[in-house]
Every structure is written in C-alpha cells, then in structure tokens.
C-alpha cells in the first residue's frame, strides 16, 4: 500500500532515527494528520505482527544483518550500482568493510545514473565518498555500450545536474540513433504482442491499466 511504501522509505533513509516517520512526513509533504497517525499506528502494529510470527520484510533483512554483524569472511568486497544505495544499505557496506576482513573494497557507480532518490537512494553519500582524498578513483573512460548520438545527448543532459562528479568518457565507435517515443503513437501497437509498462507507483499503474482497458 502507499502507507507501507512511506514506512519502508523512512527505514531506508533514516535507519537509526527514532523520529524517522516525522522526517519522512516532512519530505513527502504529508499534511494529513489523520493519515500520519494511521501510518504511525500501522508501523507499530506491523512490527508487532512480524515479531509475533517471525516474519520479515525486505528492509528487515538489512536491519538484522547490521544488528547481528553477521558478515561472511571475504578477501575482496565488490559493490555495484552504488549510486542507488540507501542510507540503510550503506550501513551494510560499512559493516561489511569492518567485519568481513576484506583486504580491499571496490565500489562501482555513476552519479549521473542515480534515478532512485525517490526510493531512498543516498546519492550525497556516494558523491562525498568519491571526493574523499583517502579513496582511489579509477574512471572508466571508454564506453562499449553507448553510441555517439546517445553519448552527445546524455552529456548535454548531465550538464544540467546541479551537484555531480565531473567525468569524461568516450562512446563506442558507432553513430547509433536516438528515438523519442510518445504513448500516443504507441496506442496502435499495443494491440499486438506483449508489452511491459514500468511505473514508479502502484497508483500510476492503476491509472495506466484503467486507460488501456
């Protein structure tokens, strides 16, 4: 439900904060006090429900992993798509660095591809870490996936990002093409074959589903 999504977002962004729900209320501009009270009660009831039945949700695995310090022994630690990690997931990374015995930690990511801030991604942590002089940065200067036309557009769009890590890389040696598709001209094509439409929230899925029906 939408309320459960708000609770999970609060735990992802503020894993240690006792006032995590008030914090997330301010961010989501949730001004309905009745809804706030309902969410707070839902959080309490859900925690008790899971505890009584020994049930777990996605965020609970991170909470227990950090609490129990149940890190496996590792020689090397690799973290991919790091720009999408939440504050809670960064805690997991930090705990692994401390408890796993890893000799080196390799973290891969691209702040320009950070598209999950709405789901709690802590891009500021990623940027701060990349700017830390104690860390060694190894830029990947050659893309083997992006053609020239897409590289040109992506570079132009990236310049509008207010806070980012400056970077330069070369596209693959192919002009390629870029297409801008609109839902309207796609309507006819939706009559045939299988289509997958991705939406950010269940509410949008519902609206799209009703429209297509």
Region locations from a protein language model:
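Conserved helicase motor core of SF1/SF2 NTP-dependent helicases
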Residues: 76, 83-175, 196-210
């Amino acid at each position: 439900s939408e309320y459960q999504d708000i609770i999970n977002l609060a735990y992802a962004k503020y894993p240690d904060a006792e006032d995590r729900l008030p914090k997330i209320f301010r961010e989501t501009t949730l001004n309905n006090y009745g809804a706030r009270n309902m969410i707070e009660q839902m959080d309490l009831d859900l925690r008790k429900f899971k505890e009584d039945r020994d049930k777990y949700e996605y965020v609970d695995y991170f909470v227990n992993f950090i609490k129990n310090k149940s890190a496996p022994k590792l020689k090397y630690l690799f973290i991919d798509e790091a720009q999408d990690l939440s504050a809670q997931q960064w805690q997991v990374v930090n705990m692994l660095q401390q408890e796993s015995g890893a000799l080196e930690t390799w973290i891969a990511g691209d702040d320009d591809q950070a598209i999950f801030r709405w789901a709690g991604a802590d891009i500021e942590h990623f940027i701060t870490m990349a700017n830390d002089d104690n860390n060694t940065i190894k830029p990947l200067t050659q893309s083997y996936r992006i053609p020239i036309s897409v590289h040109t557009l992506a570079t132009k769009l990236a310049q509008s990002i207010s806070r980012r890590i400056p970077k330069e890389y070369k596209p693959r040696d192919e002009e390629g093409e870029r297409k801008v598709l609109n839902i309207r001209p796609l309507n006819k094509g939706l009559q045939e074959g299988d289509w997958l439409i991705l939406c950010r929230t269940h509410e949008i899925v519902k609206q799209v589903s009703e429209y297509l029906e």
